[in-house]
A protein has these predicted regions:
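Short linear capping/connector segments at secondary-structure termini
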Residues: 21-28, 103, 212-217
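Rossmann-like NAD(P) dinucleotide-binding subdomain of oxidoreductase/dehydrogenase enzymes
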Residues: 25-162, 200
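Long amphipathic alpha-helix in the N-terminal Rossmann-like dinucleotide-binding domain
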Residues: 1-19, 30
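Acidic catalytic patch
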Residues: 17-22, 36
Length: 223
């Protein structure tokens, strides 16, 4: 996914940065109007622990492609991945262009006291509120990618086997450590028992009779 993001940006970056002709207001009659994309400046990227490599590198790729410099703050809950990312960044970029800050809450708090031209945060709603609060002091634009609720609805017309297969896959992917993993199921009472039976079958089919021993079942990084 990271490589595909790099390829996508390389393929489309000229189009993304091209001037676009826009309507000229009457007060500017006889002139021509354009919009021209430009970088924000210094961008802070704060990435989460559930997909620590992907969700650090993807926004970094886009920020660099847009001409920004970046401070990247990976999660303290995935320290080995953070060390690897820091090593890679040091080998590929000068610290004036991209720098990695590791650590936990103290480092996050310190960073949010600084002025940035843009902040991209992926994580929980509680921390997202704090990021928004701190950024407002500098009127810094922010993108918040936060966790939410992802219910699944199974009614009496559903293909129960297909629904069970997809829900089990979605819930157990990365041990449920995915922002859009199903939180709960709203199931019609008339198909509840049959649906639960299909769910149990799918768990066994996808992960065996002892899921915790399955090589397809990952690790819980943060309870």
């Amino acid at each position: 996914l990271v490589l595909s993001e790099i390829s996508y940006m390389l393929k489309h970056i000229r189009r993304f940065t091209r001037e676009k002709r826009v309507h000229t207001p009457l007060s500017q009659f006889h002139s021509r109007s354009f919009t021209k994309p430009g970088p924000y400046g210094v961008v802070l990227i704060m990435s989460p622990w559930n997909y620590p490599f992907l969700l650090s590198l993807d926004p970094l790729i886009d920020a660099i492609a847009a001409g920004n410099t970046v401070i990247l703050k990976p999660s303290a809950y995935s320290p080995n991945t953070s060390k690897l990312i820091e090593k890679m960044i040091r080998e590929c970029f000068s610290p004036e262009m991209v720098a990695v800050v590791t650590g936990g809450r103290a480092e996050n708090t310190s960073l949010l006291e600084e002025y940035f031209d843009y902040i991209f945060f992926t994580g929980s709603q509680n921390v997202g509120r704090e990021v928004m609060k701190k950024s407002s002091a500098h009127l810094t634009p922010v993108t918040l990618e936060l966790g939410g609720k992802s219910p699944c609805i199974v009614d009496e017309s559903a293909d129960l086997k297909l629904a069970a297969r997809r829900i089990v896959f979605g819930k157990y992917l990365n041990c449920g450590q995915t922002c859009v993993a199903p939180d709960y199921i709203c199931c019609h009472s008339s198909v509840k028992d049959a649906f639960l039976a299909e769910v149990k079958k799918q768990i066994s089919l996808q992960f065996g009779e002892q899921p915790l021993s399955s090589s397809n079942y990952g690790k819980i990084i943060n309870e």
